[in-house]
Structure formats: C-alpha cells, structure tokens
Amino acid sequence: MNQLEMKKLAAQAALQYVKADTIVGVGSGSTVNCFIEALGTIKDKIQGAVAASKESEELLRKQGIEVFNANDVSSLDIYVDGADEINPQKMMIKGGGAALTREKIVAALAKKFICIVDSSKQVDVLGSTFPLPVEVIPMARSQVGRKLAALGGSPEYREGVVTDNGNVILDVHNFSILNPVEIEKELNNVAGVVTNGIFALRGADVVIVGTPEGAKVID
C-alpha cells in the first residue's frame, strides 16, 4: 500500500465524525485534499465548510460544498486537518503548505480537532524529520531569522512563497522541540512572527493514522 492510499484510508475514516447539518472545519494539504473528496460524497448531509486555505476553498467548491467565512461562524463541531509531524501527545508540526496561521484560526473555532495522517508522520520528538515553519511579516524576516538562530535553529527563507495573508515563511531546521507548548509560546512572542507551526496549545483530540493494515484511531 502506497502513501496516497494510506492518506485516503485516514481521510475516509474521518467521515464518521461528521454530523448532519453541521459546518465542518477543513485544513489544507494533500491528506486534507483526500478528505475533501470524501466529504463530497456526503455533501447533502452537511451545511458546508470553513476552509483554512484558498486552495481548500476551491476544492470544496468543486465538490459542490458551500464555503463559509470564519467570521460568520461562532463555532465548529469538528476541524479536520493533516500534519507534517505528530507526537504521541497529539501535538503537531504543520505549515508545509504555508497555511499555518489560517489553520490555527479555524482549529480554534472547533470543539474537536481530528488529525488525519499516514504512518510516516508519527515521531517521538517534534522537529525530528521536518523543519518548523514560521510565518513572518516580510519586513521582519532578517531579524526574526537572527532570533531563531540564537535559539539554536537554522532558519531558511522559503523562496518564492507568499502566504494567503501576504507574509513569508522561514523554515527552521535542526530544531529539536522537546517542550512544544513553551516553544510555541516563546516563538509567538517574537516581534514580527505571525505564528509558528507548532500546534501544541491546541493539539489534536483524535488522530486517525492510515497504515497498511487500515485506519487506526487514537483518541
């Protein structure tokens, strides 16, 4: 079974958490694209969705699913998103697709965060296999980079990428994140940082892992 098939298994399994007549929070990325496709099969059951990226909005509309603005929704029953890494405490690194800020906004609206991944995304320590994305106001890129280097990381400017919010991304390599909650807070207090890709203050409630043996639910 290849990686895409495992992603599809996890995405399909997430449908069990979708309740009738609700608005579903939807993240972004390749695994979420599989979920949007699956959600299209039950589109008549739901009111619509709030999306964390423009790409996800477009895919939802292609499936015939109504897209709501986050400002028009007071809460969401569930938020479904993928992860670049996830640890045993259900804390994540996200932002490989540069949608981390909007993902945090939509996740904060949700009563339950469902994280869908394939088994390659599971790690013991965040930062083990994937650099930490940090969304930065463009004029602060250099000074934030110096601060990240002083904290022990190796920041790299993600060339040619502008977020949906008009900002830039620094990917921090060689950054072992042993205390995700504290590091998430510390980095978010750096002047010029919009947010960072650690999802620890608001981690996942349920993790669905696509494996060669099927979808495994961790709650």
From Swiss-Prot:
Instruction: Give the UniProt keywords, A-Z.
Output: Isomerase
Q: Which parts form a coiled-coil structure per UniProt?
A: none
Please give the positions of the paired cysteines in each disulfide bond.
none
Q: Does the keyword Isomerase apply?
A: yes
Give yes or no: UniProt keyword Secreted. no
The positions annotated for binding substrate are: 28-31, 81-84, 94-97, 121
User: Biological process GO annotation list?
Assistant: D-ribose metabolic process; pentose-phosphate shunt, non-oxidative branch
Q: What is its EC number?
A: 5.3.1.6
Q: Which reaction does it catalyse?
A: aldehydo-D-ribose 5-phosphate = D-ribulose 5-phosphate
Query: What are the catalytic residues?
Result: 103
Question: What Gene3D superfamilies has UniProt attached to this entry?
Answer: 3.30.70.260, 3.40.50.1360
Which pathway is this protein assigned to?
Carbohydrate degradation; pentose phosphate pathway; D-ribose 5-phosphate from D-ribulose 5-phosphate (non-oxidative stage): step 1/1
Which Pfam families does this entry report, sorted A to Z?
Rib_5-P_isom_A (PF06026)
Q: Which GO terms describe its cellular component?
A: cytosol
- One GO MF term attached to the UniProt entry: ribose-5-phosphate isomerase activity
- Cleaved signal peptide residues: none
Q: Which InterPro entries match?
A: NagB/RpiA_transferase-like, Ribose5P_isomerase_typA_subgr, Ribose5P_isomerase_type_A
Q: Which domain of life is it from?
A: Bacteria
Its function?
A: Catalyzes the reversible conversion of ribose-5-phosphate to ribulose 5-phosphate.
**Oligomeric form and interacting partners:** Homodimer.
Q: Which family does it belong to?
A: Belongs to the ribose 5-phosphate isomerase family.
Could you tell me what this protein is called?
Ribose-5-phosphate isomerase A
Tell me what organism the protein belongs to. Haemophilus influenzae (strain ATCC 51907 / DSM 11121 / KW20 / Rd)
Q: Per UniProt, what is the name of the gene that codes for the protein in this document? A: rpiA
